[in-house]
């Protein structure tokens, strides 16, 4: 099961590296989704719920989590209980924000799987190392765990080195340096593709890595185009 947070503008599912839930659902990686929708007023929830049901809800079972920060009252809970039926969800999960700290659940985040913060995809010097680190984590936790003889460790070393190299470039103070950074990132991805072709990785693992790399390259191209538009 996978849970995501959707703030009032609902854009966080695609704005951050670790929150492209719509893509993961569309690829069949999620069987049942518990998106948690935060809003200051209960009336805002139904609009967000409709958007999720119309998009992500087509690819997996949907159990909506609805929260009004610490404004929970019996009346609000009763209103929230019917939203999933209205939006076509398969169930409901009511929660209240303060409980994560009151009962010590925040410690799970500090020391657990999600200890690495999300990174904005246009953040020079942070996004690419985060993307490549995620690739390395996928290789470690999936490919090498399930099929240790698939050869993925050979490309993993190159991906990790590329992440360190891009992290060493640091941030960018202006659009000219941002453009240079993203162009270097594009070259890095081309080099990794060539290295993957020569690494002798098992075919199905190679195909999946190429798909993940293509997704990263799409974001690089989008950022290059955005910077070039600003520089005109």
Give the location of each predicted region.
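Substrate-binding cleft of secreted/luminal carbohydrate-active enzymes
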Residues: 29-44, 52, 60-223
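Aromatic-lined carbohydrate-recognition surfaces of secreted/lumenal glycan-active proteins
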Residues: 1-17, 60-70
């Amino acid at each position: 099961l996978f849970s995501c947070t959707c703030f009032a503008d609902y854009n966080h599912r695609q704005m951050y590296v670790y929150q492209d839930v719509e893509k993961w659902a569309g690829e069949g990686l999620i069987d049942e989704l518990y998106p948690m929708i935060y809003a200051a007023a209960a009336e805002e929830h139904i609009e967000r719920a409709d958007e999720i049901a119309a998009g992500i809800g087509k690819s997996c079972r949907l159990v909506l989590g609805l929260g009004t920060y610490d404004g929970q009252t019996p009346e609000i809970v009763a209103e929230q209980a019917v939203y999933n039926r209205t939006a076509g969800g398969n169930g409901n999960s009511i929660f209240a924000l303060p409980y994560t700290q009151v009962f010590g659940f925040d410690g799970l985040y500090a020391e657990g799987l999600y200890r690495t913060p999300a990174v904005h995809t246009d953040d020079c010097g942070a996004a690419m190392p985060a993307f490549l680190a995620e690739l390395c984590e996928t290789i470690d936790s999936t490919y090498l765990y399930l099929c240790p003889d698939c050869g993925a460790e050979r490309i993993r070393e190159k991906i990790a080195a590329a992440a360190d190299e891009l992290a060493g470039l640091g941030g960018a103070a202006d659009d000219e340096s941002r453009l240079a950074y993203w162009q270097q990132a594009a070259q890095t991805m081309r080099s990794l593709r060539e290295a993957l072709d020569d690494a002798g990785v098992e075919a199905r693992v190679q195909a999946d890595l190429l798909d993940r790399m293509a997704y990263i390259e799409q974001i690089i191209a989008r950022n290059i185009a955005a910077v070039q538009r600003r520089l005109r």
